[in-house]
Amino acid sequence: MFYTLLFTGLRRSEALALRWRDVDLVLRYISVNRTLHQLNDKSFVFRQPKTEKSRRTVALPPFLSIVLRQHQESQQKQRALLATAVSDDDLIFAQLDGSPLLPHSITNAWRRLVKQAGFQGVRLHDARHTHATLMLKQGVNAKITSERLGHSSVVITLDTYSHVLPGLQEAAARGFDEGLGRTTQDVISSTG
């Protein structure tokens, strides 16, 4: 699940609600159309995503497609031991019997993993922030990054990740010079 959060920028509640029919491992995309929440009485409820723009299709990198295929095969083997089959309506991330994972158990597993790796203060939601930051640093258009995250507008993405933008401004300025075929030495030579 952690790979999915990091490589797609999904929210925890969105990933927990994914069914196998929501993913296409051949065309490599995930359809986000619901979220999973645990109520105070310990029951689960599926809800509409946070905003209309949160209902979205997110392209999968090839690596994640392979990881999810392996996860699906593992899940099928585990279910075979229980004499049950995995269906398209089954949750991708589930207990052995197919029931939903507890949201707080995912967060606790993340904390243990982070601690074992020697990091402190890295929250599960930071996987989403890392995804967005890396997308923007790689020069991915802010609109595309916003769509992947399911933000209601690109303004939210730009406001949230403005710390990434100063370096991008400098890179864009250098890129403009390079696009015109000019170097710093050319400018010095022509003005000197």
Segments (PLM) and residue ranges:
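Conserved hydrophobic/aromatic pocket- or pore-lining residues that grip, position, or stack substrates
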Residues: 4, 15, 32, 60, ...
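Generic leucine side-chain signal with a strong bias for well-ordered alpha-helical environments
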Residues: 5, 10, 16-18, 64, ...
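Short, basic (Lys/Arg/His-rich) helix/loop patches that form interaction surfaces
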Residues: 8, 58, 74-84, 88-147, ...
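Short functional hotspots where side chains directly engage DNA or cofactors
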Residues: 27-33, 123, 134, 146-164, ...
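Short, charged phosphate-coordinating catalytic segments
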Residues: 5-36, 143
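C-terminal secondary-structure termini that scaffold catalytic or DNA-interacting sites
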Residues: 27-28, 36-64, 70, 74-77, ...
